[in-house]
Amino acid sequence: MARIWASEAVADGGSAGGRVPPEVQRITGYLRMSAVSGIGFAVLFGAALVLLREAPGLGVPDSAYTAFYRDGGGGVLVTIGLYVVPFAGIAFLWQLAATRAVLSASARAHQSPPEIPRLLQLASGVLFVAMLFAGSAAVGAIALLGSFSVDPLPSPEVARALAATGYGLLFVFGVRAAGMYMITTTTLARAVGLFPRWVAVVGYLAAAFLLVSTTFHPAILLVFPIWTVLVSVVLLVRAGSPNKPPSH
């Protein structure tokens, strides 16, 4: 990234007069967009996770499912959580698009990102959102029935099966997609000098943890938004100091 700004400054006659080249302004805008949308995704995702966790877990007895939905436990918290999830996904798609725009701009500075990681980054990001939507819908399906249907609710066995489906989509497939997104984004950003080395190390370690983890504890779902916040802060710093090379 420093190479991009340096080449643009030379092409525009340096920083004489304090005028920022248009290309640098555009890339800085992409950096801010990626950072702001990334922080927005992390906040919305965390709020949705807290709300959806009000639903009974897989290890509780059938009586807990019956009591929870009979007493209206899913009427507010779980339903609101489901409505927050789409906005978290939308914010993440903005972050994905803005990040890819920054990486694409680096190609014009004679530093083309590798094509395979770029394709994998796009695929894993979209797959993560798909798993997030599908898994959340499965976990909150009974809560939606309780809020909008006049028919009797399904049996606890059905509720448990839907919850297990949602957990599988989120904790097995969604978590792995998030890990792959972290690996590819870190690789591409490091190749163009966007991330300092320590951020790359943190990203690779966190991604490896997501890829090999077998736990269904909800805390694992927080690894990805925490990494997103870290990356967003780095991008905001980069956007505020476009002429400063990345630290090593």
Regions found by a protein language model. Name each.
Residues 2-248:
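Hydrophobic, aromatic-enriched alpha-helical segments typical of multi-pass transmembrane helices
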